[in-house]
Design a protein with these regions (language model features):
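Conserved nucleotide-binding/hydrolysis micro-motifs of P-loop NTPases
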Residues: 96-98, 141-144, 178, 200-202, ...
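Extreme N-terminal, non-catalytic leader segments
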Residues: 1-68
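Conserved catalytic-core segment of NTP-binding enzymes
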Residues: 166, 170, 175-262
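NTP-binding/hydrolysis catalytic cores, primarily Walker-type P-loop NTPases
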Residues: 275-304
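Walker A/P-loop phosphate-binding motif and the immediately C-terminal alpha-helix
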Residues: 48, 56-95
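Beta-strand-loop-alpha "switch" segments that mediate conformational coupling across diverse proteins
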Residues: 251-281, 293
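Short, hinge-like loop/turn segments at secondary-structure boundaries
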Residues: 106-111, 213-214, 240-244, 280-281
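P-loop/Walker-type NTP enzyme "switch/lid" segment
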Residues: 91-166, 269-279
């Protein structure tokens, strides 16, 4: 058996080969030509502006191993900061059966992704304008049909992104927490991944497990880390360095390289905005947490 990580580490003492065999191997999404079908897709220019040209939007999956780390708040506020910088941004609630982006943003939608996927509506009807200057696609809640990855869900997610990419600069996928097959497939569709964690040992352990599984089952991509709810300056950087050391030692032969996108301090303004269902960058733009998220967004753009 491989040696355990140092006892002082809050990260999980397990070797790289301890990944559960229950996790399905993930393959890269196919990018086959859909030109005939694309010609029949609705023109989204009236909602999203004229197509941008080039390769289309960057797709960023915001994910976490553990729930309750502030992943959706982080994704929404990053989107607002990017929109302030002139980017066309859309946040897609990819937690298809247990959505909460609508709760965080105090939004309601007559049409959700469920209606789009079932053909009851097209994507134009589901697009909503979010506070902060970005667009959102909201999902449903309590929908058991999205608890497992089916061929239909795979196909609908992939084609939806192909439809949206030409019109946007950045698409943020707000995934569910954990390592379900739906979460892993959603992450596989992204160009880059942001793992959100907190200094809590269980959150760090789950972040480590998430990174390990992505490294083992998916293609290499830029991998960002954001440490939320830190208690002191520099805590996030120290935890990121510690996490990288554990990856270097136990995940091989070529361990993933983490890029620390930022650390967000514990801030009462965040709790106030959560309770009021308000966007932090809109309601408390000068708060320490909002400033940290704005800095993280600028680093994300610099990494493009």
């Amino acid at each position: 058996m491989s040696p355990r990580p140092p006892a002082v580490s809050p990260l999980p003492p397990q070797p790289a080969d301890a990944v559960s065999s229950d996790v399905p191997p993930m393959t890269d999404p196919t990018h086959d030509s859909l030109s005939a079908e694309a010609a029949a897709w609705p023109d989204l220019s009236d909602r999203l502006g004229r197509p941008r040209g080039g390769d289309g939007a960057r797709v960023l999956a915001v994910t976490s191993g553990k729930g309750g780390v502030g992943k959706t708040q982080v994704g929404a506020n990053l989107a607002a900061a990017l929109a302030r910088g002139g980017q066309r941004v859309l946040v897609l609630d990819a937690d298809l059966g247990l959505a909460n982006l609508d709760v965080v943003l105090n939004l309601s939608a007559r049409i959700t992704l469920h209606q789009v996927f079932t053909g009851e509506a097209d994507v134009r009807e589901a697009l909503v304008d979010a506070p902060g200057g970005f667009h959102a696609l909201l999902a449903g809640s309590g929908l058991v049909e999205y608890s497992r990855l089916t061929p239909e869900v795979r196909d609908r997610l992939q084609r939806l992104l192909q439809q949206l990419r030409p019109y946007l600069d950045v698409i943020v996928l707000d995934t569910g927490a954990g390592l379900s097959d739906v979460v892993l497939y959603t992450v596989s569709l992204a160009d880059e991944v942001l793992v959100v964690t907190t200094p809590e040992p269980t959150a760090l352990a789950d972040a480590y497990a998430t990174i390990k599984v992505l490294d083992r089952h998916q293609r290499p991509r830029p991998l960002h880390l954001l440490v939320n709810q830190v208690q002191r300056a520099g805590e996030g950087a120290a935890l990121a360095a510690q996490l990288q050391q554990v990856l270097d030692r136990y995940v091989g032969p070529r361990p993933p390289r983490l890029r620390l996108l930022g650390e967000v301090p514990s801030d009462t303004a965040v709790r106030d905005c959560v309770l009021r269902r308000q966007l932090l960058l809109e309601q408390a733009p000068g708060s320490p947490a909002a400033l940290a998220l704005a800095l993280a967004a600028s680093r994300l753009m610099a990494a493009a």
